[in-house]
Amino acid sequence: MSKFIEPSSEDIKIEQLYKDMGLSDEEYAKVCDILGREPNFTEIGIFSVMWSEHCSYKHSKPFLTQFPTSGEHVLMGPGEGAGVVDIGDNQAVVFKVESHNHPSAVEPYQGAATGVGGIIRDIVSIGARPINLLNSLRFGELTEKQNRRLLRGVVAGIGGYGNCIGIPTTAGEIEFDDRYDGNPLVNAMCVGIIDHDMVQKGTAKGVGNSVIYVGLKTGRDGIHGATFASEELSEDSESKRPSVQIGDPFVGKKLMEATLEAITFDELVGIQDMGAAGLTSSSSEMAAKGGSGLHLRLEQVPTREQGISPYEMMLSETQERMLLVVEKGTEQKFLDLFDKHELDSAVIGEVTDTDRFVLTYEDEVFADIPVQPLSDEAPVYVLEGTSPEYNETKNDYSSVDVESVFDQLLQHPTIASKRYLYEQYDQQVGANTIVKPGLQASVVRVEGTDKAIASTIDGEARYVFNNPYEGGKIVVAEAYRNLISVGATPLAMTDCLNYGSPEKKEIYQQLADSTKGMAEACEVLSTPVVSGNVSLYNETRETSIFPTPVVGMVGLIDDISYLNHFNPSVGDTLYVVGDTNDDFGGSQIEKLLYGQVNHEFESIDLSQEVRKGESIKQAIREGVASHVQTVGKGGLLLTLARISAHYQLGLQAKLSVTNAQLFSETQGRYIVIVKNGQSLNCDYAVEIGKVTNDQQFKVTNEQSEIVRDVKHLNDLWEGAIPQCMTATD
């Protein structure tokens, strides 16, 4: 008789328990076909997480194949824990972005903290030392108490984990819109550095080689976390707090250092983080990639409490754990290393030649599954999509009250300074951060060299909602411009696709069209996709989030001396690069004045993006530019205001645009500040003004004049979010 009391195979079938785990009738039937029998409780649990949307990408896989994944600098693309890109001198940059949306909606502190911990382990599992963290966040409007609570918890969780483990958080972006009420997006990105010959893979091969577990003891936290992340949020989601993992950054730090030492051992065969789906995904994926079988003896798994069943062990998402495959006979060398770092570890199995994934507990078999079908035969769904109907009524911007709109947009949390939030993050630990949060890209020195890695993270929603294909191109181009703005050469990107339910025709079409646009932009801008993540079913009470693809991009600065002059001063000249048109679809002014965003906008010219980018990058490298800012949310006027407030400098500019166009969000534009006595050599550049010493922000056009004291401007910009967050609940 089994030591554990669990539903029988017959119970699972008759009571349709598989549906509670997220499997359909058809998927259950497919499992039965693969096994040649009805699955037991542990087996159906394993299939349910491996075939969940979060792990299998069953609705998005056809679209992901569009992305270019190879290129001049790519050493390792999708399929491993993170992408690896060459930066010269036998070094590479390793990076990836992941979502932790559903857990953060239920338990914001732990949801965000474990999102940070998980992405760090992805980078470490490749063998890289993390050098910085980034994040992309979305919340509902801060007028709502619930959204303020979520924001506080998420920011505290990000800072709490990153600060404790000793990795600086150097860049990010946050936007606010009521479409994210109760359904925040928390996307975390990590960047690391590695030597070429130290790159590791998550593979299990070599018959007889041993499987070693290391890290926190397994508990019952996070069981079915992958399944939870693959369903819509509902009023019952609060009851799923046990599906949210608990992070321990102090153990995370020990595990990181131990892992980075373990990768120097020649006897290491493969290594993988135990992330989504825990021991199930790490072990079965390693076996599949190695073309091997595995036998795990689950009584050897370190557990936090007695009585944890094989089902619970395999589906637990206890944090701070790694799985290694090491050469037979060298186990003690690794166990001694982990003992030195005060980590629990154990040999829990071995590689076999059976091509079967076998789990036993004290010789009782709890699972016997063919490896390849579990990993490779998850269902893939190609559905029918429908383009949404848009409101074709043309909004009138002919009588815009410039003064009122300017003050309101400057203080909207999406545009306002985020200093109140990012000051909770340690930005300098490691002492290699050159450009800190507040600008569009971070710059971190590659230790011991004159090189630096520039990194940025950028998401787009309203444009993607308005026109998914063009919006997909825009989000890639925005990240590209952010790297150009610090003089970096963009190398490659990672993506996180945040959408609602793909089973709804309009959302499925948004996913299809936006990924097509992203793929096209990647090709033209030479930024292949080397890693990524998909997060679907981001819906609450039948309301879907905006489709929100997020792009993390890295670039190389081959000589950090380029940035020595990067600080504007009085007498410098202002240029705008790129034309301004009537582009209000999806803009901040459209949302402010009309309460909705559903109008078309002009298409983006990707070939122009490349030409402008090369000219601006050259200006930075030649010491001509003292600051570069992409024109983003709120348009030209708000971009100039942010520069003035950020540097506490007066600006005087005259713009050849209408009042409404002051707030237009035409793509492909930059503000370039050029050193006094220099000029900008760029076909698309127009001189518009100067940096002044009178502490006045003054912008004029044919119709209006906006004048603000810089201190007052800064007080409004810096004070907006603190004022929202200290509102009486």
From Swiss-Prot:
Class of this enzyme: ligase
Binding site for Mg(2+) 2: D122, D273
Keyword flag Ligase: yes
Record has ATP-binding as a keyword: yes
Molecular function GO labels: ATP binding; magnesium ion binding; phosphoribosylformylglycinamidine synthase activity
Residues reported to bind substrate: S99, H100, N101, H102, R121, Q245, E317, T318, Q319, S535
Binding site for Mg(2+) 1: E98, N533
Domain of life: Bacteria
Residues involved in ATP binding: Y57, K96, D495, G532
UniProt-recorded name of the protein: Phosphoribosylformylglycinamidine synthase subunit PurL
Subunit structure as annotated in this protein's UniProt entry: Monomer. Part of the FGAM synthase complex composed of 1 PurL, 1 PurQ and 2 PurS subunits.
Gene Ontology cellular-component terms listed: cytoplasm
EC code: 6.3.5.3
Swiss-Prot/TrEMBL catalytic activity: N(2)-formyl-N(1)-(5-phospho-beta-D-ribosyl)glycinamide + L-glutamine + ATP + H2O = 2-formamido-N(1)-(5-O-phospho-beta-D-ribosyl)acetamidine + L-glutamate + ADP + phosphate + H(+)
InterPro entries: PRibForGlyAmidine_synth_PurL (IPR010074), PurL_linker (IPR041609), PurM-like_C_dom (IPR010918), PurM-like_C_sf (IPR036676), PurM-like_N (IPR016188), PurM-like_N_sf (IPR036921)
GO biological process: 'de novo' IMP biosynthetic process
Subcellular location: Cytoplasm
SUPFAM superfamilies: PurM C-terminal domain-like (SSF56042), PurM N-terminal domain-like (SSF55326)
Pathway(s) it belongs to: Purine metabolism; IMP biosynthesis via de novo pathway; 5-amino-1-(5-phospho-D-ribosyl)imidazole from N(2)-formyl-N(1)-(5-phospho-D-ribosyl)glycinamide: step 1/2
Active site: H54, H100
Organism per entry: Staphylococcus saprophyticus subsp. saprophyticus (strain ATCC 15305 / DSM 20229 / NCIMB 8711 / NCTC 7292 / S-41)
Matching CDD domains: PurL_repeat1, PurL_repeat2
UniProtKB keywords: ATP-binding, Cytoplasm, Ligase, Magnesium, Metal-binding, Nucleotide-binding, Purine biosynthesis
Pfam families, per the entry: AIRS, AIRS_C, FGAR-AT_linker
Family: Belongs to the FGAMS family.
Function comment: Part of the phosphoribosylformylglycinamidine synthase complex involved in the purines biosynthetic pathway. Catalyzes the ATP-dependent conversion of formylglycinamide ribonucleotide (FGAR) and glutamine to yield formylglycinamidine ribonucleotide (FGAM) and glutamate. The FGAM synthase complex is composed of three subunits. PurQ produces an ammonia molecule by converting glutamine to glutamate. PurL transfers the ammonia molecule to FGAR to form FGAM in an ATP-dependent manner.
